[in-house]
Amino acid sequence: MSVESSSSSLLAPAAALPGWFGKLPGMGDFAHRRLPEAFRAVWDQWLQRGMSRLRDRADWTERYLEAPIWCFALGRQVAGDQAWIGVLMPSVDGVGRYFPFALAVELDASVPGCLQGKALAAALRWWAFATQAALEGLDGDLDAVRFDAVLQRLFVADSGASSDVREGGVESLDLPLAGTSLWLGDPSVENGVRMLSTGLPRDEQFEALFLGFAEEG
């Protein structure tokens, strides 16, 4: 089953391809596709503020580049009126300016608050393919046209494409309520790293995304 058909009940009707926002090495500067202004305005302001905070840390570049890709879910009223799922990856443009890269897609209004069964499998598959696409964009120095070709291949063309989804590790996933966001290191495992935030992560929570969680002790 293709990603498009398996997730048809999960994603908004117009969401055949994910939208994206940010920087990749194959692009000379910032770019975006298929994300509404209501999402982009909130997202850009959030990242600009957070990256400014990171730059106050002397060792931030090394730790930033080693940060994981995060899978996220946004409740309504976080980045516009709608709910979203996506992935966020530390990245850099073609001239060495650091800025994260995100793929996101709007959730259908009928999606239940707790994902189970086929709905959960569709979300896990979407996150896996979005992560794969982000890594191909980063490692392949892809420009916007070639990156969209990757999305077309993964999300539309390859009905038999495989992914690294480890189905069965988690039986359900509660989506965040309105005004909150959920951040997952690996959404396919039951006890993976996760963070729940009011709105988008700020201050110490933003640092945790890109510099790592503080060690307890």
Where are these predicted regions, by residue range?
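N-terminal ordered "arm"
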Residues: A12-A67
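Long protein-protein interaction modules used by eukaryotic assembly/scaffold proteins
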Residues: S2-F30, R34, Q77-G217
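Short, structured protein-protein interaction patches enriched in aromatics and acidic/basic residues
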Residues: L54-S91
